[in-house]
């Protein structure tokens, strides 16, 4: 515990909590401070000027990060027949219909992302209380209810990241690993930020992107100047 506390304290040295850093400087500093014995996840958080309690201020979507996430994603697909075969051929880890629903209802969730064909949704709908709180319920708005199961599986395994604003108006995601080079992390952060900006809801008024911060699993958070994150 003492070693961990010492490492955390050291990682905060030279960090000005009041400063707005440029993206390039922030990424460099975060990488330098990611000194844990595992490959730390780099996460970006955006505080938005929305109130998600109102339907016209909900922010959600999916973005394909250009350099992937650096993590292995297990994908489950609810499908039958030819579509089930397509999912398996595309690399899905778990494929099934009624039997898969029973497995999930029994509490076994051995996957990170869930895809379904439209005809399966009446069946998958029974899993709302199980998958919903985990953010894994298939949804056509983010491409996880689709007939193109092969494309969805490949996207999920290739760096697709879903995002959804939380109650406090914050949207966040893991966008890579500390082992990524700085350019790859910057490109991923910009891709994520642009997707969130493009998902601006009609009900959002005033300043949409209020604050942006980047951090590693065990490192400090650095505030970023929002003007430096957009690729547009």
Swiss-Prot record:
Family to which the UniProt record says this protein belongs: Belongs to the universal ribosomal protein uL1 family.
GO biological process: regulation of translation; translation
Organism annotation: Sinorhizobium medicae (strain WSM419)
A Gene Ontology cellular-component term: cytosolic large ribosomal subunit
Listed Pfam families: Ribosomal_L1 (PF00687)
Keyword vocabulary terms for this entry: Repressor, Ribonucleoprotein, Ribosomal protein, RNA-binding, rRNA-binding, Translation regulation, tRNA-binding
Functional summary from the UniProt entry: Binds directly to 23S rRNA. The L1 stalk is quite mobile in the ribosome, and is involved in E site tRNA release. Protein L1 is also a translational repressor protein, it controls the translation of the L11 operon by binding to its mRNA.
Protein name: Large ribosomal subunit protein uL1
UniProt key word rRNA-binding: yes
Molecular function in Gene Ontology: rRNA binding; structural constituent of ribosome; tRNA binding
Disulfide bonds: none
InterPro entries noted in UniProt: Ribosom_uL1_bac-type, Ribosomal_uL1, Ribosomal_uL1-like, Ribosomal_uL1/biogenesis, Ribosomal_uL1_3-a/b-sand, Ribosomal_uL1_CS
Subunit structure: Part of the 50S ribosomal subunit.
